[in-house]
């Protein structure tokens, strides 16, 4: 599937833009890309990963698309700020190896910073 085909479980642009602005204001690097949704945790073979990467998807996630689809159905605002824990394409920082020491602390701190940015963005966006 190519991004944009099928059912589009997209973010509310105003909320997504507000989150991006909050992240930028805090100096938190971010990227905005399409995410591939899968119904099975850790079920992607190397071939599946290569295929979705080749088609422009920049990550994989289980929950976001379902949450967005339900929110969209009910007319609710929706956006996500996902933290990349590992890179399935280049296989760097594999979650299978676990997070250790400084990397674990960094991820915990970054998670907290992103959460505050999202809360602030949601509070300021109608």
Give names to the regions the model predicted.
Residues 1-126:
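Glycine-rich phosphate- or other oxyanion-binding loops that anchor nucleotides, phosphorylated ligands
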């Amino acid at each position: 599937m190519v991004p944009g085909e099928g059912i589009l479980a997209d973010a509310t642009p105003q909320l997504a833009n507000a989150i991006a602005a909050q992240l930028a204001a805090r100096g938190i690097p971010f990227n905005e890309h399409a995410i591939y949704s899968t119904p099975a945790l850790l079920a992607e073979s190397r071939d599946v990963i290569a295929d979705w990467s080749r088609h422009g998807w920049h990550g994989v996630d289980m929950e976001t698309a379902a949450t967005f689809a339900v929110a969209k159905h009910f007319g609710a605002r929706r956006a996500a700020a996902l933290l990349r824990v590992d890179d399935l394409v280049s296989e760097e920082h594999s979650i299978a190896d676990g997070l250790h020491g400084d990397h674990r602390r960094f991820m915990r701190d970054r998670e907290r910073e992103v959460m505050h940015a999202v809360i602030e963005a949601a509070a300021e966006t109608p």
